[in-house]
């Protein structure tokens, strides 16, 4: 049995002024022609950064210390990348010539980009157009619905799993609305219903927030009342895939030995939930309903 976890992080900060020396250490004093309001000498980029710490607020702190140029023509974004992979493996041989390999994988990666532009009027930096993009994959188990009838044009137009997907949408929408904080100032009422769709306002039948949990619940056989509402489910929902190999057929038969040197039977099951790519909405404001 083995378990592996790996994570990779990176930071790209255009306009970084200091010139690190040995092992990245180096004292830096801002150029007084550009940074007349900052005279403090600092170590850039700092020990936490050198040992691998990736601070989401690194660009803002760098701007306050005079590490970023105030050239207003700078047009490259501050970028942070992050990826993590969990890998579980197990190999079992219950008896000779029978091998069972079990594995489960969860991988998440993202890239966050944001523009830090100097504002000569406020004498500070403005953070603008933050966006997050990435992809996700996780091993799941859809065996409960893998052999369900597909349906036909004459009788049932859709499979049972697909029908469940459509039915579960309303349950998921209600759960999402109930978990949202009411905000009278913005006019949001979690009990309000769209007169056309009959779904809670803000969580329609075609909303990705509704469809993704409904899809996972329908095709994995989970309850729509308990399935994770997160589009990137945690390790709690990770399920294994497997491969079974039996190579003992020939060794057990004298007759087969005359005609075959080796004969193996294999059975494998693989199912995964994949988000090929995602990107955040530039107009999204997570503080509106806080």
Regions found by a protein language model. Name each.
Residues 1-290:
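Exposed, low-structure sequence patches enriched in small/polar residues
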């Amino acid at each position: 049995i083995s378990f592996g976890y790996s994570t990779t992080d990176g930071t790209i900060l255009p306009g970084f002024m200091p010139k690190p020396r040995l092992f990245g250490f180096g004292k830096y004093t801002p150029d007084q022609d550009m940074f007349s309001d900052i005279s403090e000498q600092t170590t850039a980029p700092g020990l936490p950064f050198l040992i691998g710490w990736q601070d989401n607020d690194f660009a803002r702190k760098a701007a306050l210390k005079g590490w970023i140029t105030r050239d207003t023509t700078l047009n490259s974004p501050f970028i942070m990348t992050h990826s993590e992979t969990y890998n579980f493996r197990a190999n079992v041989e219950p008896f000779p010539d029978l091998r069972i390999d079990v594995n489960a994988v969860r991988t998440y990666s993202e890239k966050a980009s944001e523009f830090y532009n100097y504002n000569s009027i406020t004498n500070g930096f403005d953070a603008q157009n933050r966006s997050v993009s990435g992809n996700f994959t996780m091993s799941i188990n859809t065996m409960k619905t893998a052999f369900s009838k597909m349906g036909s044009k004459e009788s049932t137009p859709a499979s049972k799993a697909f029908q469940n997907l459509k039915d579960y949408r309303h349950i998921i929408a209600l759960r999402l609305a109930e978990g949202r904080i009411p905000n009278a100032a913005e006019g949001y009422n979690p009990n309000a219903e769209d007169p056309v769709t009959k779904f809670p306002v803000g969580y329609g039948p075609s909303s990705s927030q509704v469809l993704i949990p409904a899809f996972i619940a329908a095709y994995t056989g989970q309850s729509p009342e308990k399935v994770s509402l997160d589009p990137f489910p945690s390790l709690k929902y990770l399920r294994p895939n497997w491969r079974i190999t039996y190579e003992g057929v020939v060794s057990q038969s004298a007759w087969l030995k005359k005609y075959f040197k080796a004969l193996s039977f294999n059975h494998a099951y693989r199912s995964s939930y994949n988000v090929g790519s995602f990107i955040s909405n530039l107009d999204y404001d997570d503080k509106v309903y806080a």
